[in-house]
Amino acid sequence: MPRSLSRSVSPRPRSPSLSPPRPDSRSSRGRSLTPDDIPAYKRKRSPSPNPRDRPASPPTRRRRSQSPYRNSNRAEIDRPNVKDIDPNRRRARENALLEKQINMALADDGDADGTVATTKKSADEIARAEFAKLLGSRSGGAYIPPAKLRAMQAEAAKDKTSAEYQRISWDALKKSINGLINKVNISNIKHIVPELFGENLIRGRGLFARSVMRAQASSLPFTPVFAALVAIINTKLPQVGELVLIRLISQFRRAYKRNDKTVCHATSTFIAHLCNQYVAHEIVALQILLLCLDRPTDDSIEVAVGFMREVGQFLSENSPKANNTVFERFRAVLHEGQISKRCQYMIEVLFQVRKDKYKDNPAVPEGLDLVEEEEQITHRVTLDDELQVQESLNLFKADPNFVQNEERYNAIKREILGDSDDESGTESGSEYSESEDDEDEDVAPEKAGIQDMTETNLINLRRTIYLTIMNSLNFEEAVHKLMKVNIPEGREIELCNMVIECCSQERTYSNFYGLIGERFCKLHRIWTDAFQEAFQKYYDTIHRYETNKLRNIGRFFGHLLASDGISWAVLHVVHMNEEETTSSSRIFVKIVLQEMVEEMGINRVAERFRIPDLKPAFAGMFPMDNPKNARFSINYFTSIGMGKVTEDMREYLQNAPKLLAAQQAALAAAESSDSDTDSSSDISSSSDSDSDTDSDASSYSRRSRRRRYSSDSRSPPPRRRRYSSDSRSPSPPPRRRQYSDEPRSPSPPPRRRRYSDDSRSPSPPPRRRYSGDSRSPSPPPRRRYADDSRSPSPPPHRRRYSDDSRSPSPPPRRRRYSDNSRSPSPPPRRR
């Protein structure tokens, strides 16, 4: 193009407000524009602004927009716009969406062979980098969708030795320990402990110590619970308990130096309860007290008082001298008066708490005495020791022997919990189920291995029953509420005991309790048996109760018996005799029977006692085996106004002699029959001797009669004289016979004379009887002995038997010593 033309074509700078030249317009020189100049004038301009907003002078330079025709071969993709509050997360999401759009655009163009593979590889690398960043940061790193995160975790879990898997397990361990510690309390501590042992507490002991200290500092009322938890774990894993104690002492020292009263109070409270649980030695408690009381200030006194209230009972039992020294120091500080009135009042309250024996601050609360003192391991860590708090245990660190350490802890866990589930993986399905059953059977006793020796459940049950009874308006409401109480199987007797104890505590008997017992007895057989068992127990121990309690208990059981709540067969435990009863038991039986008579009447009670089926149960109350016991029982029941029930025993006493005689006869017959069966020869010989004795006695009676007849008629037969000559004595002189025969009548009947003699002297003394033989009024005794000289040497005291010789059947042995010569001689066997 000519230079002149180019100079004329190049336009001057113009303002944007100027309108472009029209195609048919011409220059001032009268020449038209060339076609090369048309595109320069074919651009779109922005609308003209308001004339008032136009600048005073046009711009010196013009900015021309990039022509779209020059970059028509590049694909233009708009950057996605993501709305998110977090700028880092918004940027990451925008990059991800942009990458996705680029891949889709390249796939549409057909260039997927090289570019797409490179893009996918970079995406995986980015994801892994984000996952590594997630594991290495506290905040969690960039956002990863849950599904993608689970996929990455599953991929990392394939290699258990990798740092990623160890970090995942570390995070899970930390969350589990925190969750279990945050939800522990008195009621569920027995279930939390096995779950804690299920986690690797050796690897996570730092996490456990940090978590339990944080939880205790944020909730001081639960300090005894956390101390009991640490005490249980300390019995199996002492290094865990020692680490907690070391960190607590270190934290107390730092807080004391910083004058942080809140942290000092929380930490000292935890240490006090660890001392109560025998995890920490009492030396550290005494050191803390002496440190706080050495240079007393208001804050140190407040910490010391709070610490002493928690550990005072423990020190009074285990270190009484040191405890007295501490209280003497408290008294000295109080008398010095250098502290505020508030702290002085706190010390006075502490002395009152000590006087009350720490009833509101027990060393170990109810339900937390879960460890035997012999099993506990006590750590002697003091304030002056060099402590290793091991803060590195709170942070994650890859373990090159991770798998081996996990297996070791699994062995420890099986030893603690009795769990054996590692061998079930290589067995069949049936064997696997059997092994699970065996595991359950093995684990169950271990869970119950932490025995509660304080009977907390029993105490809570009794408290519930007592409050339920006291809060009821009538017996029906009480029974309805008590039936809803969850009473363990085999503990039904506790409800009966509580009802009876509540009844005994009243000033006077209330029928409210009797109706409760009656309703329970009629609801189910279990309660009937329980109240019958309670009757036997209270009868055996009734001597322990006061008179008022005894009366209430007796009336309660009297109501149950009268209403047929319990069987009358329970009275078999009553033995009414002097040896087996006491004054308390007799009073108890009296009150029971009087209550029964008051409700039923004496007639019905007496009829009930006569029921044949129940008589064996009443054998002890109405004894008929011994007159002494029967007499005692009759006197007892008569004295209490129940003589009507003793009629059978009175009849027994009347017939007792006859019964005793019959019993003795039967006993003698039994003994004789036993002796008769010894030998047949003894029986025959004894029968022969008895027959000989009987024959001799009969012959003697006949001979004595004939002698009397002969003496009266003065003409004895020759046989009679022959028998007399056969006797040991010589023949009697006739003078003796004449003297004895003259006073008698010539021919009296022998029988009549004998009766007349008997009638004259029915019971004469010995001398009168001797005179009666001669019929003389006063015969000299010496003459009579002279007449009796026909016998060789008759002893004087034997002569009284001569008068008995006239009887029809005198004893055989005494016939030999009769003074009458006319008496026959004894049989030869008796000689």
UniProtKB/Swiss-Prot annotation:
Predominant localisation class: cytoplasm
SMART domains: MA3, MIF4G
The keyword Nucleus is assigned to this record: yes
GO annotation, cellular component aspect: catalytic step 2 spliceosome; cytoplasm
Record GO terms (molecular function): RNA binding
Region (Disordered): 1-89, 414-450, 670-831
Composition skew (Acidic residues), residue ranges: 433-443
Compositional bias per record (Basic and acidic residues), positions renumbered to this chain: 73-89
InterPro entries with a match to the protein in the record: ARM-type_fold (IPR016024), CWC22_splicing_factor (IPR050781), Initiation_fac_eIF4g_MI (IPR003891), MIF4G-like_typ-3 (IPR003890)
Record Pfam families: MA3, MIF4G
Quaternary structure note: Associated with the spliceosome.
Job description of the protein: Involved in pre-mRNA splicing.
Protein name: Pre-mRNA-splicing factor CWC22
Gene that this polypeptide is encoded by: CWC22
